[in-house]
């Protein structure tokens, strides 16, 4: 029992007011571990106060562990406040508690530091990183539904906003909630100034994630669990375990065995999310097999 770690004061201290503060807290938490192997992957852009932007990693536990838990934050930039706090809390917890010999934790802090620093969901190129994991050597997916909504999502002038909003409401009624949400937020690769844009090539964050995957030799581990922290969907204050593995797959079965029946599946309609294109989940699925 570690009451000091789970006190409101401790949990509040895990949360930062901005990206720079979150990075500093994460670095400090890593420095308290003698062998965390803290690393930085630096971006060419800077934050609003000219601060350096980095995706940082740390490793707790046996370097040769066959089982690895990956904790990833700020895929959607501004959502990183929650994920970063969880990572800091976890690092603090294992100051006093020891991991099993064959289990390690890989922390990936601020996968999208630009969005985190500038309070944006997207990255430095206006890309939704969680739609960027498609095969850019193949023809890109076409979101026909988004095409029908695009002009009203981004009207040409402010005077058209009210009428556009009404048309979108009518579209939602016509299409139904799920079809509308898939069209709106499922991901698109055609309108660079639109919402949920997945880009035309691999982002810097994606390239760094691929580098991290190989640097830590994750392909050689026997079991990998990945928790990518997001906020904004579902009931306030409730943590939904969303699994985007194909229905009935070994990944879904394993997730439910580990995390229980609270695991939801967008493909089956049991989640607050809908099926989407180019998720970072698909990178992990493809890389781990």
Predicted features by range, described:
Residues 1-289:
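Structured catalytic-domain cores with a bias toward divalent-metal coordination
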